[in-house]
């Protein structure tokens, strides 16, 4: 009898996190077959308070969804200071930046409490989520959208890079600050996201889409503009 009650509670708990995850705007863009595969491929990963789930500088291996627990996102600066970027709770996801941009982890994620994470391996993430979610536009298409007032440029490079060369009228929010700064963006606007090559901006588009923003990736980044001007 006890086993039956425990199993029912576990099934209800599984249903709750899956239902919550399906509310993400990400799942509005992917086929039903992909959604089913995501839930099949995801594996449970128990964690304890103090566990470092992601370490800055490491290679990206998994995309994470917090089923239970809370975590903190921090970044170590070049001067040795630790900056707190965000606190994550059940229903939050993290780890997509390094997977999409194929770069090293740009922050630490440490558990504040015991919990359970659901994780998806890099190859499965790329095949099931990343591909269908990222919508790209060419430089010509982006120019028309921005010129008509239908969209705004969003530069996710570092502030120093933005000051050195940026598209007129663009907003600058470095990728590593984007989680913290999304509240400053307008859900009623479209955003054309760019960086130098498209790597960082790909991560930004995924993160923004996940949060319900209408975001598009400038294909090939600023390199596309250089090619358009100097073919």
Residue ranges and their predicted role:
Residues 1-164, 177-179, 200-219, 223, ...:
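Cytosolic regulatory regions built on CNB/CRP/Popeye-like sensor folds
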Residues 162-168, 185, 228:
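Short loop/helix-cap segments at secondary-structure boundaries that form the rim of catalytic
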Residues 169-192:
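Helix-loop module immediately N-terminal to the HCX5R catalytic loop
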């Amino acid at each position: 009898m006890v086993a039956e009650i425990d199993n029912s509670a576990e099934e209800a708990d599984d249903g709750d996190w899956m239902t919550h995850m399906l509310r993400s705007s990400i799942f509005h863009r992917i086929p039903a077959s992909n959604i089913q595969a995501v839930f099949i491929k995801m594996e449970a990963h128990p964690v304890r308070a103090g566990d470092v789930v992601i370490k800055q500088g490491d290679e990206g291996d998994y995309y994470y969804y917090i089923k239970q627990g809370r975590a903190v996102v921090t970044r170590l600066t070049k001067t040795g200071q630790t900056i707190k970027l965000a606190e994550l709770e059940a229903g939050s996801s993290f780890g997509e930046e390094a997977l999409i941009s194929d770069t090293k982890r740009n922050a630490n994620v440490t558990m504040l409490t015991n919990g359970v994470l659901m994780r998806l391996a890099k190859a499965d993430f790329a095949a099931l989520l990343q591909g269908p979610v990222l919508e790209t536009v060419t430089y010509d298409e982006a120019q028309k959208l921005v010129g008509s007032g239908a969209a705004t440029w969003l530069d996710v490079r570092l502030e120093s890079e933005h000051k050195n060369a940026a598209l007129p009228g663009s907003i600058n929010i470095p990728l590593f600050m984007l989680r913290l700064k999304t509240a400053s963006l307008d859900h009623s606007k479209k955003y054309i996201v760019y960086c130098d090559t498209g790597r960082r901006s790909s991560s930004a588009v995924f993160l923004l889409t996940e949060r319900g923003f209408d975001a598009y990736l400038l294909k090939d980044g600023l390199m596309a503009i250089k090619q358009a001007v100097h073919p």
